[in-house]
Amino acid sequence: MISTCHSWHMFQIRNREMDVFYRGISVLGTCFFLLLAWKMLNWAWIKPKKLEKRLRQLGLKGNSYRLLIGDLGETSQMDKEAKSKPINFTNHIIPRIMPFLHKIIQSHGKNPFIWQGPNPAVIITDPELIKEVLTKNYTYQKPPSDDLGKLISQGVAAYDKDKWAKHRRLLNPAFHIEKLKHMLPAFHLSCSEMLKKWEKLASASAEGSFELDVWPYLQDMTSDVISRTAFGSNLEEGKNIFKLQKEILEHILQILQSFYFPGMLYLPTKRIRRMKKISKEVHSSVLNIIMKRVEAMKAGEPSNDDLLGILLDSNFKEIENDNGNNSNKNCGMSFEEVIEECKLFYFAGQETTAVLLVWTLLLLSKHPEWQMRARDEVLQIFGNSEPDFDALNHLKVITMVINEVLRLYPPGFMMSRVIHEDTKLGSLSLPGGISIFLPTIMLHHDEELWGDDAKEFKPERFSEGISKATKGQFIYFPFSGGPRICIGNNFAMLEAKMALALILQRFTFEISPSYTHAPHTLVTLQPQYGAQLILYKR
């Protein structure tokens, strides 16, 4: 009897313990759910509304926050509508390439705020404030890369603070002007091979003239330049890497033009599986090239004058100078980091120069008087000889033309930064957690800054240099500005000058009747339907 009572008592104790346990689990589950719900509510509504209130108190104007989507719905609709309608061949392109931003500035003034989903972004168009943002790069940082961006490349363009400083320091030798001189033959060879294809088309034409969409040819030429200058003797492997990188970018653009949300890359769709497979192939191919180069350098072979060789040499010297001090984690790059920099060479180097060249050819076609002046300068300096480095840097008319094209059609039409803490910008006390947008093209086209002819193609405005054209104001920054100015800007300018000199030596060109003027924004500012020209062999 006593035993039975004891057993029953123990059963009741265990039952109560289990009851307490399950109640505890239930309470913890409820607390977790409430915490998660609170975080979601704060992210989706409370925090955006608080930030909106702060921004309005600063005198900034913008649309009221819409739950989750913000201004994205209207932006997407206006972009879609704008892209469906080509425009006359004028340089008044802002309403087409960024219609929502154009509308919001007209409605709310030059410094409004917009909503990227639940995240507000303040538009800054004051030159002095933009200068401050680009100069103080430790305060105003690059936005973190999302999953799609990481598939293309990371590299110095994506890093901040000490990591950015280290990579920039190690990359600088590769883009020193003395190193660029050694890359000039690669520029010449790649462009000459493109022009041989054009000459073949001219020979096949009974009239001696032919129509050609020059845009894909320029893309192929600039990718060939990057392959040669980045990997040198590994040219074919480099070209294959570029093809894979280009395919990834095409997939990403298709995703962005349909519907993208964070975490999408975890879905097992056919496209995403293909993207991940390509990314692994690119990683493996670049690593293979790097390891072969490292082994060759260890065996005493020269590092070569290509970008990879110079980067590896710079990296090894930094590690050696550290004298094996393993405590210095900021010394040198890992192989993974070198891979990302090589991927960035492709992505940034090819796009920038290709779009600069295509808009230059189109504008010189529209303005034959400037095409003639540019050609006369090239023939006077080079004749039909191969352009050399020193003379390329003395092409005044060509430089004026390029600067004006970069003003009207900057490859990077918009820049963004984020602030993580409350920050004073001019008279604005901006709250931490917001983005800052710097619309490069809007300053480049601003009639209050450049005059009534701001949207006209007038290279003569740069006849006495950039400083004189801008009257010392910070209103021209096609390659960004401050410490983070594009590290490859001299590379791009030299390549563009070489290509233009060779094209002008061999061809005259005019706009084809089939050309449709439709600038649009992907990663850079591109011609949506190509760039059809009529070319004449000289």
Curated annotation (Swiss-Prot):
One of its GO terms (molecular function) is monooxygenase activity. It is found in: Membrane. It is a multi-pass membrane protein. This is Cytochrome P450 72A225. Heme binds at residue 486. The gene is CYP72A225. PANTHER family: CYTOCHROME P450 72A11-RELATED, CYTOCHROME P450 FAMILY MEMBER. Its EC number is 1.14.-.-. InterPro entries: Cyt_P450, Cyt_P450_CS, Cyt_P450_E_grp-I, Cyt_P450_sf, Cytochrome_P450_Monooxygen. Pfam families: p450. Glycans are attached at residues 88, 137, 325. PROSITE patterns: CYTOCHROME_P450. Signal peptide: none annotated.
